[in-house]
Protein backbone atom coordinates (compact mmCIF):
# COMPACT_ATOMS: atom_id res chain seq x y z
CA UNK A 1 0.00 0.00 0.00
CA UNK A 2 2.87 2.37 0.82
CA UNK A 3 4.35 1.90 -2.64
CA UNK A 4 0.95 2.57 -4.22
CA UNK A 5 0.45 5.86 -2.41
CA UNK A 6 4.05 6.86 -3.16
CA UNK A 7 3.49 6.18 -6.84
CA UNK A 8 0.28 8.19 -6.90
CA UNK A 9 1.99 11.09 -5.17
CA UNK A 10 4.88 11.03 -7.62
CA UNK A 11 2.42 10.80 -10.47
CA UNK A 12 0.54 13.89 -9.36
CA UNK A 13 3.66 15.94 -8.66
CA UNK A 14 6.02 14.74 -11.34
CA UNK A 15 3.88 15.20 -14.42
CA UNK A 16 2.64 18.58 -13.24
CA UNK A 17 6.24 19.80 -13.15
CA UNK A 18 7.42 18.32 -16.42
CA UNK A 19 9.31 20.53 -18.86
CA UNK A 20 9.82 18.65 -22.12
CA UNK A 21 12.67 19.27 -24.57
CA UNK A 22 11.72 21.07 -27.79
CA UNK A 23 13.57 18.50 -29.89
CA UNK A 24 13.35 14.70 -29.90
CA UNK A 25 15.99 13.20 -27.63
CA UNK A 26 16.04 9.56 -28.62
CA UNK A 27 15.76 7.56 -31.78
CA UNK A 28 15.77 3.81 -31.19
CA UNK A 29 15.81 1.67 -28.08
CA UNK A 30 15.00 -1.75 -26.65
CA UNK A 31 13.79 -2.91 -23.24
CA UNK A 32 14.11 -6.61 -22.49
CA UNK A 33 14.29 -9.41 -19.94
CA UNK A 34 16.36 -12.58 -19.93
CA UNK A 35 13.98 -15.39 -18.90
CA UNK A 36 16.86 -17.61 -17.78
CA UNK A 37 18.56 -15.15 -15.42
CA UNK A 38 15.78 -12.67 -14.80
CA UNK A 39 18.10 -9.83 -15.82
CA UNK A 40 16.38 -6.68 -17.04
CA UNK A 41 17.88 -4.20 -19.46
CA UNK A 42 17.53 -1.23 -21.75
CA UNK A 43 19.75 0.03 -24.56
CA UNK A 44 19.49 3.10 -26.75
CA UNK A 45 21.27 5.00 -29.53
CA UNK A 46 20.51 8.55 -30.61
CA UNK A 47 21.61 11.58 -32.57
CA UNK A 48 21.54 13.56 -29.35
CA UNK A 49 24.22 14.33 -26.78
CA UNK A 50 24.40 12.03 -23.73
CA UNK A 51 21.17 10.12 -24.29
CA UNK A 52 21.62 7.62 -21.46
CA UNK A 53 20.72 9.59 -18.32
CA UNK A 54 17.30 10.61 -19.66
CA UNK A 55 16.17 7.57 -21.64
CA UNK A 56 17.41 4.42 -19.88
CA UNK A 57 15.88 3.32 -16.57
CA UNK A 58 15.94 -0.06 -14.82
CA UNK A 59 15.69 -1.50 -11.32
CA UNK A 60 16.46 -5.03 -10.18
CA UNK A 61 13.38 -7.11 -9.53
CA UNK A 62 11.12 -4.36 -10.87
CA UNK A 63 11.48 -3.57 -14.58
CA UNK A 64 13.03 -1.40 -17.26
CA UNK A 65 11.85 1.71 -19.12
CA UNK A 66 12.94 3.58 -22.25
CA UNK A 67 11.35 7.02 -22.60
CA UNK A 68 12.09 8.92 -25.81
CA UNK A 69 10.97 11.15 -28.70
CA UNK A 70 9.92 14.50 -27.15
CA UNK A 71 10.97 13.00 -23.89
CA UNK A 72 9.39 13.22 -20.47
CA UNK A 73 11.97 11.66 -18.13
CA UNK A 74 9.27 11.15 -15.48
CA UNK A 75 8.17 8.01 -17.31
CA UNK A 76 11.36 6.34 -16.07
CA UNK A 77 11.19 6.70 -12.28
CA UNK A 78 7.40 6.80 -12.13
CA UNK A 79 7.04 3.76 -14.34
CA UNK A 80 9.42 1.84 -12.10
CA UNK A 81 7.62 3.03 -8.97
CA UNK A 82 4.26 1.87 -10.33
CA UNK A 83 5.67 -1.54 -11.28
CA UNK A 84 7.28 -1.83 -7.85
CA UNK A 85 3.83 -1.16 -6.38
CA UNK A 86 2.48 -4.20 -8.23
CA UNK A 87 1.29 -2.79 -11.55
CA UNK A 88 2.13 -4.66 -14.73
CA UNK A 89 4.08 -2.85 -17.41
CA UNK A 90 0.86 -2.18 -19.32
CA UNK A 91 -0.96 -0.90 -16.24
CA UNK A 92 1.94 1.41 -15.44
CA UNK A 93 2.02 2.67 -19.02
CA UNK A 94 -1.73 3.28 -19.10
CA UNK A 95 -1.61 5.23 -15.84
CA UNK A 96 1.15 7.51 -17.08
CA UNK A 97 -0.23 8.05 -20.57
CA UNK A 98 -3.67 8.91 -19.20
CA UNK A 99 -2.27 11.88 -17.25
CA UNK A 100 0.15 13.19 -19.91
CA UNK A 101 -1.07 16.16 -21.94
CA UNK A 102 1.90 15.71 -24.27
CA UNK A 103 1.35 12.02 -24.94
CA UNK A 104 1.02 12.49 -28.71
CA UNK A 105 4.75 13.23 -28.99
CA UNK A 106 5.94 10.54 -26.58
CA UNK A 107 7.41 7.14 -27.29
CA UNK A 108 7.89 4.76 -24.38
CA UNK A 109 8.74 1.09 -23.89
CA UNK A 110 8.37 -0.78 -20.59
CA UNK A 111 8.94 -4.28 -19.29
CA UNK A 112 8.26 -5.63 -15.81
CA UNK A 113 10.03 -8.32 -13.82
CA UNK A 114 7.65 -10.99 -15.11
CA UNK A 115 8.44 -10.16 -18.74
CA UNK A 116 5.19 -8.33 -19.47
CA UNK A 117 5.79 -5.57 -21.99
CA UNK A 118 4.08 -2.34 -22.96
CA UNK A 119 4.88 0.19 -25.67
CA UNK A 120 3.39 3.48 -26.82
CA UNK A 121 4.10 5.62 -29.88
CA UNK A 122 2.25 8.93 -29.97
CA UNK A 123 0.33 10.01 -33.07
CA UNK A 124 2.59 13.04 -33.58
CA UNK A 125 5.91 11.23 -33.21
CA UNK A 126 8.19 12.19 -36.11
CA UNK A 127 8.25 9.49 -38.83
CA UNK A 128 9.37 7.02 -39.58
CA UNK A 129 8.26 5.89 -36.14
CA UNK A 130 6.96 2.61 -34.81
CA UNK A 131 7.42 -0.22 -32.38
CA UNK A 132 7.17 -3.96 -31.98
CA UNK A 133 6.64 -6.17 -28.94
CA UNK A 134 7.68 -9.77 -28.54
CA UNK A 135 8.20 -12.26 -25.76
CA UNK A 136 10.30 -10.53 -23.09
CA UNK A 137 11.12 -7.45 -25.16
CA UNK A 138 9.89 -4.29 -26.83
CA UNK A 139 11.66 -2.21 -29.48
CA UNK A 140 10.70 1.35 -30.40
CA UNK A 141 12.09 3.91 -32.83
CA UNK A 142 11.38 7.35 -34.22
CA UNK A 143 13.00 9.65 -36.78
CA UNK A 144 14.20 6.61 -38.70
CA UNK A 145 15.55 6.66 -42.22
CA UNK A 146 13.43 3.57 -42.99
CA UNK A 147 10.23 2.13 -41.60
CA UNK A 148 11.88 -1.30 -41.34
CA UNK A 149 14.13 -0.47 -38.38
CA UNK A 150 12.00 -1.80 -35.52
CA UNK A 151 11.30 -5.07 -37.33
CA UNK A 152 15.04 -5.48 -37.92
CA UNK A 153 15.71 -4.88 -34.23
CA UNK A 154 13.10 -7.41 -33.19
CA UNK A 155 14.43 -10.06 -35.55
CA UNK A 156 18.00 -9.49 -34.39
CA UNK A 157 17.05 -9.78 -30.73
CA UNK A 158 14.98 -12.91 -31.23
CA UNK A 159 17.57 -14.70 -33.36
CA UNK A 160 20.75 -13.81 -31.45
CA UNK A 161 22.57 -15.84 -28.82
CA UNK A 162 24.43 -14.71 -25.73
CA UNK A 163 23.51 -12.95 -22.52
CA UNK A 164 21.12 -10.03 -22.29
CA UNK A 165 23.80 -7.38 -22.85
CA UNK A 166 24.89 -9.09 -26.05
CA UNK A 167 21.34 -9.37 -27.36
CA UNK A 168 20.67 -5.70 -26.61
CA UNK A 169 23.80 -4.70 -28.53
CA UNK A 170 22.83 -6.87 -31.48
CA UNK A 171 19.44 -5.13 -31.62
CA UNK A 172 21.08 -1.69 -31.69
CA UNK A 173 23.51 -2.80 -34.39
CA UNK A 174 20.63 -4.12 -36.48
CA UNK A 175 18.90 -0.74 -36.28
CA UNK A 176 22.01 1.09 -37.41
CA UNK A 177 22.61 -1.40 -40.23
CA UNK A 178 19.06 -0.70 -41.42
CA UNK A 179 19.83 3.00 -41.71
CA UNK A 180 19.15 4.14 -38.17
CA UNK A 181 18.34 7.75 -37.35
CA UNK A 182 17.89 9.93 -40.42
CA UNK A 183 19.99 12.62 -38.65
CA UNK A 184 22.95 10.36 -37.89
CA UNK A 185 24.34 9.16 -34.57
CA UNK A 186 26.02 10.65 -31.51
CA UNK A 187 25.42 8.83 -28.23
CA UNK A 188 24.38 5.46 -26.82
CA UNK A 189 23.81 3.70 -23.51
CA UNK A 190 23.17 0.28 -22.01
CA UNK A 191 21.83 -0.58 -18.56
CA UNK A 192 21.46 -4.18 -17.37
CA UNK A 193 20.42 -5.07 -13.81
CA UNK A 194 20.08 -8.36 -11.97
CA UNK A 195 16.76 -10.15 -11.79
CA UNK A 196 16.59 -9.94 -8.00
CA UNK A 197 17.65 -7.01 -5.87
CA UNK A 198 20.47 -7.62 -3.41
CA UNK A 199 19.94 -4.40 -1.49
CA UNK A 200 23.20 -3.09 -2.94
CA UNK A 201 22.42 -1.14 -6.15
CA UNK A 202 26.07 -1.06 -7.23
CA UNK A 203 26.04 -4.86 -7.22
CA UNK A 204 22.70 -5.07 -9.04
CA UNK A 205 23.91 -2.87 -11.93
CA UNK A 206 25.77 -5.40 -14.06
CA UNK A 207 26.27 -3.04 -17.00
CA UNK A 208 25.76 0.72 -16.74
CA UNK A 209 27.67 2.24 -19.64
CA UNK A 210 27.11 5.52 -21.47
CA UNK A 211 28.68 6.98 -24.58
CA UNK A 212 27.98 10.71 -24.43
CA UNK A 213 29.56 11.87 -27.70
CA UNK A 214 31.17 9.61 -30.31
CA UNK A 215 31.16 9.26 -34.11
CA UNK A 216 30.25 5.55 -33.80
CA UNK A 217 28.53 5.25 -30.42
CA UNK A 218 27.19 1.70 -30.75
CA UNK A 219 30.59 0.39 -31.81
CA UNK A 220 32.18 2.16 -28.84
CA UNK A 221 29.46 0.80 -26.56
CA UNK A 222 30.29 -2.74 -27.66
CA UNK A 223 33.97 -2.13 -26.88
CA UNK A 224 33.12 -0.94 -23.38
CA UNK A 225 30.77 -3.87 -22.75
CA UNK A 226 33.62 -6.25 -23.57
CA UNK A 227 35.97 -4.27 -21.34
CA UNK A 228 33.41 -4.40 -18.51
CA UNK A 229 33.24 -8.17 -18.92
CA UNK A 230 36.99 -8.30 -18.30
CA UNK A 231 36.69 -6.14 -15.20
CA UNK A 232 33.84 -8.28 -13.89
CA UNK A 233 36.24 -11.21 -14.07
CA UNK A 234 38.94 -9.16 -12.34
CA UNK A 235 36.45 -8.41 -9.57
CA UNK A 236 35.63 -12.11 -9.33
CA UNK A 237 39.33 -12.87 -9.00
CA UNK A 238 39.63 -10.30 -6.22
CA UNK A 239 36.79 -12.01 -4.35
CA UNK A 240 38.55 -15.35 -4.57
CA UNK A 241 41.75 -13.78 -3.27
CA UNK A 242 39.96 -12.48 -0.17
CA UNK A 243 38.78 -16.06 0.42
CA UNK A 244 42.32 -17.40 -0.12
CA UNK A 245 41.12 -19.46 -3.09
CA UNK A 246 44.17 -18.74 -5.23
CA UNK A 247 43.55 -21.35 -7.91
CA UNK A 248 40.08 -19.97 -8.58
CA UNK A 249 41.44 -16.42 -8.46
CA UNK A 250 44.08 -17.22 -11.07
CA UNK A 251 41.43 -18.80 -13.30
CA UNK A 252 39.23 -15.70 -13.11
CA UNK A 253 42.15 -13.35 -13.74
CA UNK A 254 43.37 -15.38 -16.70
CA UNK A 255 39.89 -15.30 -18.21
CA UNK A 256 39.92 -11.51 -17.82
CA UNK A 257 43.18 -11.29 -19.77
CA UNK A 258 41.67 -13.38 -22.56
CA UNK A 259 38.72 -11.04 -23.05
CA UNK A 260 40.63 -7.87 -23.95
CA UNK A 261 44.08 -6.79 -25.05
CA UNK A 262 46.49 -5.77 -22.29
CA UNK A 263 46.48 -2.15 -23.47
CA UNK A 264 42.76 -1.87 -22.77
CA UNK A 265 43.37 -2.37 -19.05
CA UNK A 266 46.73 -0.56 -19.15
CA UNK A 267 48.32 -3.77 -17.90
CA UNK A 268 45.95 -4.15 -14.94
CA UNK A 269 44.67 -7.60 -15.86
CA UNK A 270 48.02 -9.36 -16.44
CA UNK A 271 49.59 -7.64 -13.42
CA UNK A 272 47.11 -9.14 -10.97
CA UNK A 273 47.39 -12.56 -12.55
CA UNK A 274 51.11 -12.30 -11.80
CA UNK A 275 50.56 -11.21 -8.20
CA UNK A 276 48.12 -14.04 -7.56
CA UNK A 277 50.47 -16.61 -9.06
CA UNK A 278 53.20 -15.43 -6.68
CA UNK A 279 50.78 -15.79 -3.77
CA UNK A 280 50.07 -19.31 -5.02
CA UNK A 281 53.85 -20.02 -5.00
CA UNK A 282 54.00 -20.23 -8.80
CA UNK A 283 56.84 -17.74 -9.11
CA UNK A 284 58.20 -18.62 -12.54
CA UNK A 285 54.70 -18.81 -14.00
CA UNK A 286 54.07 -15.23 -12.86
CA UNK A 287 56.91 -13.65 -14.83
CA UNK A 288 55.26 -13.56 -18.30
CA UNK A 289 52.25 -11.75 -16.83
CA UNK A 290 54.41 -9.17 -15.07
CA UNK A 291 56.26 -8.54 -18.32
CA UNK A 292 52.99 -7.96 -20.14
CA UNK A 293 51.97 -5.38 -17.54
CA UNK A 294 55.33 -3.61 -17.68
CA UNK A 295 55.10 -3.29 -21.46
CA UNK A 296 51.94 -1.24 -21.01
CA UNK A 297 53.24 0.99 -18.21
CA UNK A 298 56.59 0.93 -16.43
CA UNK A 299 54.93 2.19 -13.23
CA UNK A 300 53.87 -1.37 -12.47
CA UNK A 301 57.46 -2.10 -11.41
CA UNK A 302 57.27 0.55 -8.68
CA UNK A 303 54.01 -0.90 -7.40
CA UNK A 304 55.71 -4.24 -6.73
CA UNK A 305 57.62 -2.71 -3.81
CA UNK A 306 54.45 -1.24 -2.30
CA UNK A 307 52.29 -4.36 -2.24
CA UNK A 308 53.88 -6.17 0.74
CA UNK A 309 52.65 -3.41 3.07
CA UNK A 310 49.11 -4.35 2.01
CA UNK A 311 49.77 -8.06 2.41
CA UNK A 312 49.55 -8.70 -1.32
CA UNK A 313 53.14 -9.91 -1.86
CA UNK A 314 55.63 -11.52 0.55
CA UNK A 315 58.03 -9.35 2.57
CA UNK A 316 60.94 -10.82 0.65
CA UNK A 317 63.28 -8.22 -0.84
CA UNK A 318 65.15 -10.81 -2.87
CA UNK A 319 61.92 -12.05 -4.45
CA UNK A 320 60.67 -8.53 -5.15
CA UNK A 321 63.95 -7.64 -6.81
CA UNK A 322 63.74 -10.79 -8.93
CA UNK A 323 60.19 -9.97 -10.05
CA UNK A 324 61.16 -6.44 -11.08
CA UNK A 325 64.19 -7.76 -12.95
CA UNK A 326 62.02 -10.25 -14.83
CA UNK A 327 59.42 -7.58 -15.60
CA UNK A 328 61.99 -5.52 -17.47
CA UNK A 329 63.25 -8.31 -19.70
Where in the sequence are the language-model features?
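Sec-dependent N-terminal signal peptides
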Residues: 3-13
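Short, charge-rich amphipathic alpha-helical segments embedded
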Residues: 255-278
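TPR/TPR-like alpha-solenoid helical repeat scaffolds
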Residues: 267-272, 299-327
